[in-house]
């Protein structure tokens, strides 16, 4: 697909929390900029998260107790909040992943269904 054909993806409600949890589970402690860059890289630039999208999700996940933020220094010696997934976050990731796969399977079945029969 050429870069002209790429259209940014709009996330469904609730999916951002899931992919942030997955990113932290697989990559360890990350600050918001690292999370956004990694998701953009993995999505081949189809997913571009701005601060107005990512930061509220990080605050929400921290309030749920699913991630924990601690202040530290970046490679460029700037202060940043590093996020890690908690044990409760690991459990939430597991259950939310199961729920997502169930929903994705249902949508796929419905898209393939011949409603004429």
Please report, for each region that a protein language model flagged, where it lies by residue.
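Basic amphipathic alpha-helical segments that dock to polyanions
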Residues: 54-61
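Intrinsically disordered, low-complexity serine/threonine- and proline-rich regulatory segments
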Residues: 1-15, 96
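Beta-hairpin "wing" of winged helix-turn-helix
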Residues: 62-79, 84
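Amphipathic alpha-helical dimerization/coiled-coil segments
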Residues: 90-117
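Amphipathic alpha-helical recognition patches that constitute DNA-binding helices
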Residues: 15, 19, 80, 84, ...
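Short, contiguous hydrophobic alpha-helices characteristic of membrane insertion segments
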Residues: 9-10, 65, 116-117
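Accessory beta->alpha helical hairpin/"wing" motif in late/C-terminal subdomains of nucleic-acid enzymes
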Residues: 85-89
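N-terminal helix-turn-helix DNA-binding core of bacterial DNA-binding proteins
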Residues: 10-53
